[in-house]
């Protein structure tokens, strides 16, 4: 949580699943972003693109907050049971993957996430963000976790 000023009032803003996207001219911007706005990254899945965006002046309507990812369309458990290793290979295309096994990546399958292009389109159509660049993944490295 962070203390921030909105409409002359100090508020405690807690962003869960969101990130700050300060527009141009916002007093909390570092000097290097004062004229442009502070870039925010909105990641897609490990097999799709991610975007770097700028908040517009309308972003103040959301306390200068924007979602910090595409969002899931299915749970990790469902993704593990719904997708096969072969499905994952198709979904990943030419993205290089390094993991202890393809099975360990199933819960992060690209089709378990919303379409990042549609998410960005919605934010732009709502007048909240302006996309600067779309990034495409070249490789994914998944470390070992405690999951089985």
Mark where each language-model region is.
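Domain-length cofactor-binding catalytic modules of enzymes
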Residues: 1-148
């Amino acid at each position: 949580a962070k203390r921030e000023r909105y409409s002359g009032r100090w508020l405690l803003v807690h962003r869960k699943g969101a990130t700050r996207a300060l527009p141009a001219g916002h007093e909390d911007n570092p000097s290097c972003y004062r004229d442009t706005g502070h870039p925010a990254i909105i990641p897609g899945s490990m097999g799709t693109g991610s975007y770097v965006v700028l908040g517009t002046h309308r972003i103040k309507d959301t306390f200068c907050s924007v979602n910090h990812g595409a969002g899931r369309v299915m749970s990790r458990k469902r993704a593990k049971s719904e997708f096969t290793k072969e499905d994952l290979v198709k979904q990943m295309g030419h993205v290089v993957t390094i993991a202890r096994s393809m099975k360990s990546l199933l819960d992060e399958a690209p089709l378990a996430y919303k379409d990042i292009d549609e998410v960005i389109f919605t934010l732009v159509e709502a007048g909240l963000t302006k996309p600067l660049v779309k990034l495409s993944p070249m490789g994914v490295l998944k470390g070992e976790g405690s999951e089985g």
